[in-house]
């Protein structure tokens, strides 16, 4: 899980979701998991 100021989709499988006011990227590749904060 990467915590970044700006989250971007890294591949076509990355999905951008908002959970409890926190933007997250979920993907089939664990390396691509990110959250904004």
Swiss-Prot record:
GO cellular component: cytoplasm; ribonucleoprotein complex; ribosome
Keyword Ribonucleoprotein found: yes
Keyword hit for GTP-binding: no
Gene Ontology terms, MF aspect: structural constituent of ribosome
Key words, A-Z: Ribonucleoprotein, Ribosomal protein
Pfam families: Ribosomal_L36 (PF00444)
Record GO biological process: translation
Family annotation (InterPro entries): Ribosomal_bL36 (IPR000473), Ribosomal_bL36_sp (IPR035977)
Classification via PROSITE patterns: RIBOSOMAL_L36
NCBIfam families: rpmJ_bact
Protein family according to the UniProt entry: Belongs to the bacterial ribosomal protein bL36 family.
Official protein name in the record: Large ribosomal subunit protein bL36
Organism: Mycoplasmopsis pulmonis (strain UAB CTIP) (Mycoplasma pulmonis)
